[in-house]
Amino acid sequence: YTDKFAMSQYSAPPMSGPLVVRTFQKSVGKSPFDVFDQFEKQCTAAASIGQVHKAQKDGKTLAVKVQYPGISNSIQSDLRMVKPVANAMFGLPEKEMKKYFQEVEDKLLEETNYTLELQRSQEISTTCTNIPDIFFPVYYPEYSSPKVLVMDWLEGDHLKEFLDKKPSQEVKNRIAQALWDFYNHQLHTALAIHADPHPGNFLLQKDGRVGVIDFGCVKVVPEDFYYHYFPLLVPEIRNNQAVVDQLLSHIEIIFPQDSPAVKVELQTAFLEMTALLSRPFETENFQFTHEFIDEIYAKGEEIYQIPEVKRPTQPRGSKHALYVNRTYFGIYSMMADLQANISTHADLWSDKLKSHWGLEKA
């Protein structure tokens, strides 16, 4: 659902060299040729809301991300066109879908605020600085602005190019472990996640290290949502009916006005899917495969055939789950592409959730 609105779907033609210079000067107040020792007017990469140029300053190679002019207005215009399609897809009035639209629109517009991205980049890189095999570019506030973001230039391959070089499984496992630890640390320690696990946002090294770039899309996870959503990944909690009733009600899967039959059907379906998704967290080590991803897809198709899911009488599910689910499905897909075998370290956070719900001795 969120991918219908994702910035990856937005394509803009590259800016010409003169337009890049004008855009930079308007935002920063100086020409890029006055700020940097060297600046390449030809972009090296086009991103969803801007393009990246290479520059030199004091012997350092820098990446300069320049935002497309008018992109915020384009996003809002595109969303207005897509809303009727989404409403028809779910068969619900727009006012009942408003909270989901607002969540997506807020996230997309946040991506156009490079000052916010710089702040979050620095916060997350500081929080995750001790995670093995993960590294980040240094950001330069003194050269940046709300429409221009400057950071160190990182070398490395995106996932497809990396896999084309036939790395060893040992190196692939090391990369996967770094990504897994990076995401779980963010979520369970910082309650904020890099919510765009697109392969293009990671630069993979032949020694197994991972460079992380692009913090435009970050989902801050409310503590209240965290303690009502993630406990469902813990079998001891999922098997406690009294707690499950509270959780499913709080995250808006089940409502008081639902009939007993609908409650049973939805709870059964949701718990079956959660049990499948939580499989990696229930063992010390887990082997990701494409067959596992196919199993998730198949279960999703099966659940979609439930009448109250296919044509709901009211919106179901917390808005906060949109980007969390999108993030973890992206991670799972990357793990499968790497055919990774990882240590899940689930005990580092599952005990905290069991304690929160009074199930320490379960």
For every predicted segment, state its role:
Residues 200-204:
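Hydrophobic residue at the +6 position relative to the catalytic HRD Asp in the kinase catalytic loop
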Residues 1-184, 191, 205-211, 215-223, ...:
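Broad phosphate/nucleotide-binding scaffolds in NTP-utilizing and phosphate-metabolizing enzymes
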Residues 228-231:
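Short amphipathic alpha-helical recognition elements used for nucleic-acid or partner binding
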Residues 189-199:
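Catalytic-loop of the protein kinase fold
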Residues 236-241:
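Conserved phosphoryl-transfer catalytic core
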